[in-house]
C-alpha cells in the first residue's frame, strides 16, 4: 500500500514505515501530523485517484527530528570585471516517519 500526497509544495510517494525529509513544519518532535492533500492511494489492485484530492484519505506521520540540510554554495562570477559574489544557503527540514495511510 502506498500513497502520493502534497507537503511543502512537493509531491511525495510514501509507504507505511518510511522516513522522509519534508520542508520545515512547525510541529514539536514526537508529535503526530496529518496530511489530507492526498492525490492517490493504492491497496493491492484497488487504486483511488483524486480529482484533485481523494476524499476522506489522509497520511499520518510522526515527527522524528528537525534539522538543516548541507550547505549549498552559490557563486556569481562576472567575467572580465574582477568581481565575484559568494553566498551560501542551508535549508531547514523536518524528518517524519509515516505511521499510517487511510483512505
UniProtKB/Swiss-Prot annotation:
Keyword Zinc: no
GO biological process entries: translation
Domain of life: Bacteria
GO MF annotations in UniProt: rRNA binding; structural constituent of ribosome
Keywords noted in UniProt: Ribonucleoprotein, Ribosomal protein, RNA-binding, rRNA-binding
Record note on quaternary structure: Part of the 50S ribosomal subunit. Contacts protein L20.
Entries under PANTHER family matching the protein: 50S RIBOSOMAL PROTEIN L21, LARGE RIBOSOMAL SUBUNIT PROTEIN BL21M
Name of this protein: Large ribosomal subunit protein bL21
Source organism of the structure: Saccharophagus degradans (strain 2-40 / ATCC 43961 / DSM 17024)
Lineage: Bacteria, Pseudomonadati, Pseudomonadota, Gammaproteobacteria, Cellvibrionales
Protein's gene: rplU
Amino acid at each position: 500500500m502506498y500513497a502520493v500526497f502534497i507537503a511543502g509544495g512537493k509531491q511525495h510517494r510514501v509507504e507505511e514505515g518510511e522516513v522522509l525529509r519534508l520542508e520545515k513544519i512547525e510541529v514539536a518532535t514526537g508529535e503526530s501530523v496529518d496530511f489530507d492533500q492526498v492525490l492517490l492511494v493504492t491497496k493491492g489492485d484497488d487504486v483511488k485517484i483524486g480529482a484533485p484530492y481523494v476524499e476522506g484519505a489522509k497520511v499520518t506521520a510522526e515527527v522524528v527530528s528537525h534539522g538543516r540540510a548541507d550547505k549549498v554554495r552559490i557563486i556569481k562570477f562576472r567575467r572580465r570585471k574582477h568581481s565575484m559574489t559568494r553566498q551560501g544557503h542551508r535549508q531547514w527540514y523536518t524528518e517524519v516517519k509515516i505511521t499510517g495511510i487511510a483512505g
